[in-house]
């Protein structure tokens, strides 16, 4: 790094806006949301989504309440083109949802884009071109008048192409790409030229979208830029002013919030901040920030864990455990003073009163999460190395949510025994909890041995046979109960796990599955570990189950039995 970075980098000039009004305003309603997960988010993936994953994510975006969804860049990708046509031809877009497609200012691309959405009930077509000095001068070699002519000519072409499709309501969106780095006078001149070329009016809707293509300033500077434009755009009453913040400086959410104060009516972003480089603005965080201020966001995150699973599976990108609102650790307090404040807050919180629990800006149950692991003990009490010791000494690598669950079990035992738990003690607890599941509320009063507290179990595996079946596979499963009685159950499903669930006759939902090598044994003696996370509709939260066997299919079946046993034990304990 340079000792004097000013020799290499220049600060963005402040906006001359001495009478700025946005700092004294208060947010009172949610913006119009556009999800760009299927376009901006998709193009930033190691492996872009195929049509199946794009359709799955599209339906999830509709489910949580997005009314505008950017479905792709059809002129640049055959998969995008086919996906867009499939959505339209199969009538998969609800009447209250508007798709958006993107194109550069090129005649062939605009023609292909119109073809991709012809026949849609209503569609937004998104034009963009870069206008900042570095792009004008270095990349394109164009003057400002040439940029304006480029915009006007291609909007005129778009009007001619869409005139032959009166069955579709055409909405134009124009983005002066690199807006945040361009001269405001140039941005205004180009945007006003686009507004006039489209002839924006009561029956010709138009969106002016102002992006932080690359985030280069503090959020207040961006807010000043938005307010400056908001005051000066022509035909403002017929425009929707939109922003598209990126997160290069880590302040995309703040940029969006302050831009809304400055006049932005619409925000484009991605679930959990996916997108190019450091990502787009995280619409989940932004929406829930509004929610915690008493503003209905218009998006439903009442099962945020399910949404996170879909996003992770479709994008193949993990969500950080510290990610706001959704991370596995965001509702966990390790500090003793935090734990004390939270405990007192819960004790004082009345069901009908405003939320006032310290350190928790939102009630986790509003997001479908539980209170189970909010208060935990860390290394201050000698328990912080649980996951490390299991991995180092026993080759067990637990998923993050399983670490949270298991540490709570260990802490309960440690608190009762008032003794230090060694690595072997931890393994004993792990083995008896997951490999021989116990009933709920075990008695930890006997501090000389763990066995009295952990000896009861259910669904003991004996053997199984798998057979082909029209549904996939059929399992004949032999089980023993705690009395040693043997029984046989059967079920079918699209694989051994689904068949096992069917055989048990429980409304068990498998939320995640992982398989690992234990790193012990060679060849036929090598041990495999299967881990499932399961949920029951009648029981809050989820439970993990583990199976260990040299055959991974058998280990998977045993993992399902483990999870089911833990639920069965808890329900028996309640009875």
UniProtKB/Swiss-Prot annotation:
Pathway: Amino-acid biosynthesis; L-leucine biosynthesis; L-leucine from 3-methyl-2-oxobutanoate: step 1/4. It comes from the Bacteria. One of its GO terms (molecular function) is acetyl-CoA C-acetyltransferase activity. InterPro entries: 2-isopropylmalate_synth_dimer, AIPM/Hcit_synth_CS, Aldolase_TIM, IPM_Synthase, LeuA-like_post-cat, LeuA_allosteric_dom_sf, LeuA_N_DRE-TIM, PYR_CT. It is found in: Cytoplasm. GO terms for cellular component: cytoplasm. One of its GO terms (biological process) is L-leucine biosynthetic process. It catalyses: 3-methyl-2-oxobutanoate + acetyl-CoA + H2O = (2S)-2-isopropylmalate + CoA + H(+). Residues 31-305 form the Pyruvate carboxyltransferase domain. Residues 437-575 are annotated as: Regulatory domain. It holds the Pfam family HMGL-like. Its main location: cytoplasm. Catalyzes the condensation of the acetyl group of acetyl-CoA with 3-methyl-2-oxobutanoate (2-ketoisovalerate) to form 3-carboxy-3-hydroxy-4-methylpentanoate (2-isopropylmalate). Belongs to the alpha-IPM synthase/homocitrate synthase family. LeuA type 2 subfamily. Homodimer. This is 2-isopropylmalate synthase. It comes from Herbaspirillum seropedicae (strain SmR1). The lineage of its organism: Bacteria, Pseudomonadati, Pseudomonadota, Betaproteobacteria, Burkholderiales.
